[in-house]
Amino acid sequence: MLILLFGLALLRPLCAQTIHEERSVYRDITVTERFGRRCLLFNVHRGDRNQTCIFTDGSRRLVFDYTKMSFAGLLLKPAPKRVLIAGLGGGTIPLVLSELFPDASIDVIEIDESVARVAKDFFFFKQTDLMRVHINDARVFIKRAALKEEKYDYIVLDAFSGDYIPEHMLTQEFLEEVKQVLAPDGVVVANTFSTSRFYDHESVTYQRVFGEFYNFKLPTSGNRIILTQLKSLPSPGVMAERAAQLTPQLREYGIPFLSYPEKLSAEVDWDMSRRVLTDQYSPSNLLRDN
């Protein structure tokens, strides 16, 4: 018995400690700590998914590669002034952008009020006069912004329902609405997956709306970042110059920014014959068809 208890005592530190749990209208939410990391998890049908992790030692280093990758948008728009972020999570992306660009106006759209509260209580996210969280569906918010002819020069699409991106935020109609609120010199940064049954469909949909775009993938991450804008994409040389200028600011976040330009590709690596996603033809249809 003593040996068994001793063994359990040794195993306990290896398990993540749950410091918060709640069920929101949209999902089950858990906050855990383990090995100096605090993580936000959404509990979904296919298992728990880390949405955000931070280091608890006060370090500003970002934990996940995909979070670091999202800042590749700065290669296309180095000094954003008006930012829209769809999806809050733990608030890492808006927090870093607010530190890098303290004069930028940042609107964060989060449908789940519980997520916004957890980000504040456990992940040090704070709203300011220039950084505001709007509890709303991102598509509804963007539709209203378009009606008011508002423009953003840095748009991050990072909303996840748990298993995947909400299907109404994958369609041609939605991307056309995003296009309406994108400034002429702005950039769209979309976080999606590099290994997904929707990869080809997503790609042809972005291509239909925006034309050419950059794919950003790393072997260490299952995510891909889509980068696009209304004007012509910058050349690798221009992006290398911007990377050199911004690297000193990004170094403390552990972002290997100098290496990013050469990893962006505009090569078509998807099946061009795949069907464009629309409000009438969505991922739920694909799941039924496969």
Question: What is the predicted role of each segment?
Answer:
Residues 33, 61-184, 221:
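The AdoMet/dcAdoMet-binding core of the Class I SAM-like
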Residues 8-13:
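C-terminal segment of classical bacterial N-terminal signal peptides
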Residues 16-48, 212-290:
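Soluble small-group transferase modules, centered on the S-adenosyl donor enzyme superfamily
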